[in-house]
Amino acid sequence: MAIPGRQYGLILPKKTQPLNRVLQKPSVFGNDSDDDEASVSESLQREAAKKQAMRQTKLEIQKALAEDSTVYEYDSIYDEMQKKKEENNPKLLMGKDRKPKYIHNLLKAVEIRKKEQEKRMEKKIQREREMEKGEFDDKEAFVTSAYKKKLEERAEEEEREKRAAALEARLDVTKQKDLSGFYRHLLNQAVGEEAVPKSSFREARTVIKEEKLRGYPDETNSENRPQQNCALQSGVEEAEENPDADSDSEESCDDGERGDHKVKSRGEEDTGASTKYLKHHKNHTHSRSSSEEGGLSTKYHSRSSQSRGHEHKGGQHQDRQSRDQESCHKDRSHREEKSSHRHREASHKDHHWKRHEHEDKPKGRGQGERQDREWKREKYSSREQEKDRQWNDHDRYSEKEKKGKEKEEHRKARRERCEDGAKYRERKKPEGSGQSSERHRDRRESSPRPRPEDDLLDQERSSKARNTEKDKGEQGKPPRSETSLATKHRLTEERPEKGSQPERPPEAVSKFAKRSNEETVMSARDRYLARQMARINAKTYIEKEDD
C-alpha cells in the first residue's frame, strides 16, 4: 500500500485564504540593469523548484507502484464496479438479454421480398431479350463475378425449395395415394434408423391405470393420495423393467391401500355406497312405475276406442299379461343381483380380515391388537347383518306396494271395460224399440253364448250384493258354499228379468273418485269366489248345477 501520510489519486485542492503580498517600493535611483538581473534569478529559481517537484513526484509514483501496481488503473476499476452493479441488478440483465419479438421476422420477410423482386427483374430481362430476337447476339456480354455468385446462390435456393416441397408432399397425408409412407416409417423404426416416438402403448396403459384408480368410490381419501401416487410411480418403473410384473404391482398397491385404511373410513364408505344404491333403486322403481303407468294409459285409451273388437281386446290382455310376467322376471333378476352383490362384498371383507390376521402372525404382534381386530370384526359383521335385514325389509315393502298397484289397476281396467260396454250397448240400441221381455228371453236362450258386457255388469252387481250382505253382519250368515249357490241362482234369475226392464246407462264414475267400502273385496276367499264367478260368466255355455 501507499504511505499512510501520502494521498494518491484525484486530489481536490482546498480553499486557501489569499496571502497579502507586501509590495516593495522601487528605489528612485534604481537602474534597469538591476531589474534584468533580478528577473533572471527569479526565473532560474522557479525552474529549479519545478524540477525539484517533478523529481519528487516521480519518486512518489515509483514508490506507490512498487507497493500496489493497480493504484493508477482508474478505468479498469470503474469498469469492474459497473459490472458488479449490473450483476446485482437483474432488471438491467433482463433488459440486455431481451431479444426483439418482431424484427427478425420482418428482416426475413424483407429478404424474401428482395429475392422475389430479383426474380421478377430476371424474368423482365428475359422477356426483353426474347423481344429483341437475337439482335445483339454478336455483341460481347460482360458478366461480373458478383453476378455469377448471385446466380449460383439462386440456383441453390431453388434446389432447396424443391427438396422441401417434395418432403412436405411425402409427409402430407392428403397428398399420399397409399400407405407406403406409413409402412416405410414403421420399417425404419423397427430397423433402428428412426427413433420411436415417446407416446408408446406402455405409457398410455399406465395413464389408464391411474385414471381407473381415481374413479372408484372405495379408494383412499385425499390424505392418502401422495402415498398412492408414489406407489403408482414405483409400479410403473417396475413394469417398464419387467413387463410381466404389472398385475403383481397392482395387487401390492391395492393391498397397501387396504391395509392403511381405518375402520372409520370403511364405515363411511359403506354408508355412502348404501345411500347411492338406495337412490339408484328409487330412480329405477320410479322410472319403471312411470313407464308402466304410461303404457297402461295408452292401453286403456286404445281399449276404449276399439271396444267393438272383443277379440282384439283378448289379444291386448294377453300382451299385458306377458309384459307383466317379463317385468316380474326382471325384478326377480334385479333382486338376485343385489343379493349376490351384497354376499360378494361380505366375502371380500371377510377375506380382507383374514389376510390381516395372516400378516399379523409372522410379524409377532401382541395379543391385544389381535383381540381388538376380532372385536372390530364382530362389530362389523353385526352391522352387515343389520344392513342386510334393512335391504330385505325394503325389498318386501316394494313388492307389496307393486302388488297393490297392480290390483288397483286391474280393478280400474275392469270398471272402464264395464262402462265402455254399457255405452256401446246404448249406442247400438235402436230408438223407440218396444221389444217384449219374452223376445229378450227367447233370444237369450237361443244365443250360444252371453254377451261379455252383460256378464261384466252381472259380475259387478253380484260383488256389490255380496259386500252389502257382508256388512249387515256375520251372525246370521249361512255357510260359504250356500252363499255361492245362492248367488248363482240369483244371477240366473236376474238374467231373464233384465230383458223386461229398460236398461239404464250406468253413471260415469270418475277415475280419481274415492271408492266406497262396498266396492272393495275384503278377504282372499271373497276374491277367489269373484274370480270363479267371472270364469263362469265368461264361458260360452251354461253349466247344469248339481242340487
Curated annotation (Swiss-Prot):
Primary localization class, coarse: nucleus
Keyword field contains Plastid: no
Comp. bias regions, Basic and acidic residues: 200-217, 255-269, 308-339, 356-480, 490-506
Annotated spans, Necessary for alternative splicing activity: 105-169
GO cellular component: nuclear speck; nucleus; ribonucleoprotein complex
Cellular compartment(s): Nucleus; Nucleus speckle
Record location of the Glycyl lysine isopeptide (Lys-Gly) (interchain with G-Cter in SUMO2) cross-link: 198, 209, 279
Coiled-coil residues: 103-177, 376-417
Polar residues compositional bias, start-end: 223-232
Skewed-composition ranges (Acidic residues): 237-254
Segments of this protein annotated with the region Disordered: 25-51, 188-523
Keywords: Acetylation, Coiled coil, Isopeptide bond, mRNA processing, mRNA splicing, Nucleus, Phosphoprotein, RNA-binding, Ubl conjugation
Modified-residue entries (N6-acetyllysine), positions: 276
Molecular function GO terms recorded: mRNA binding
Annotated GO biological process: developmental process; in utero embryonic development; mRNA processing; regulation of alternative mRNA splicing, via spliceosome; RNA splicing
Residues found modified as Phosphoserine: 27, 33, 247, 252, 447
Compositionally skewed regions (Basic residues) per UniProt: 277-287, 340-355
Membrane-spanning segments: none
One Pfam entry name: NRP1_C
Function: RNA-binding protein that mediates pre-mRNA alternative splicing regulation.
Family: Belongs to the NSRP1 family.
Record note on quaternary structure: Interacts (via C-terminus) with SRSF1. Interacts (via C-terminus) with SRSF2.
Protein name: Nuclear speckle splicing regulatory protein 1
Lineage: Eukaryota, Metazoa, Chordata, Craniata, Vertebrata
Gene (name only): Nsrp1
